[in-house]
Swiss-Prot record:
Function: Catalyzes the formation of N(7)-methylguanine at position 46 (m7G46) in tRNA.
Disulfide-bonded cysteines: none
Pfam family, one: Methyltransf_4
Family the UniProt entry places it in: Belongs to the class I-like SAM-binding methyltransferase superfamily. TrmB family.
Binding site for S-adenosyl-L-methionine: E44, E69, D96, D118
UniProt xrefs under Gene3D superfamilies: Vaccinia Virus protein VP39 (3.40.50.150)
Pathway(s) the chain acts in: tRNA modification; N(7)-methylguanine-tRNA biosynthesis
InterPro entries: SAM-dependent_MTases_sf, tRNA_(Gua-N-7)_MeTrfase_Trmb, tRNA_methyltr_TrmB_bact
Annotated protein name in UniProt: tRNA (guanine-N(7)-)-methyltransferase
Sites where the protein binds substrate: K122, D154, T191, E192, Y193, E194
Enzyme Commission no: 2.1.1.33
Entry's Gene Ontology molecular function annotations: tRNA (guanine(46)-N7)-methyltransferase activity
Protein's organism: Bacillus anthracis
Name of the coding gene: trmB
Amino acid sequence: MRLRHKPYAMDRINEYSHIVIGNPEERAGNWKEVFGNEQPIHIEVGTGRGRFMYDMAKANPHINYIGIEKFTSVVVDALDKLIEEELPNLKLINKDAEDLTVFFAKGEIDRVYLNFSDPWPKKRHTKRRLTYKTFLRNYEEVLVEGGEIHFKTDNQGLFEYSLMSMAEYGMLLTYLSLDLHNSDFEGNIMTEYEEKFSSKGHRIYRVEAKYRTEPMQ
């Protein structure tokens, strides 16, 4: 998908620097001070236009959320939503998630969401998938002990790869759905892509995976 250039994007992001946090590496270890409370912190890697994070933050005021999106022309759409109705428990980061361990201290995050990530279907691009072992290691580094990843996609190939990658990493798969919208799962909050794909009849896959607190036997 080609992203439309928005020349005003950086000016708007700079104007609302209390929402889109600049220099997040300077906040590592101090994100609870940014929010001004001791609530748990959940992050979404690849937050896109922010609907999921916005709806989650609105539904769960007792949890703090951070949406991470590297494309400026996309994250500004998420910002616009927050300008209309600011939520004190939602912040944004306009950076590449490859630097996750620089943005957060060890054990600072309670949960990671991955929603409809780029599948990078070509084999030579495997390392770019957000469930590749390098990314799994980064998530583990910033998550609390026994922290979780919640992952959704409509791409069967990426889902199967992700299950294998998580299992090989030694994670515990605590929830699995091969057809989320026809399951008994309650409280699902949709992303923009999820609504679009499911309306076309695409099956939505979901997995919740937990890092082990003890080595595998």
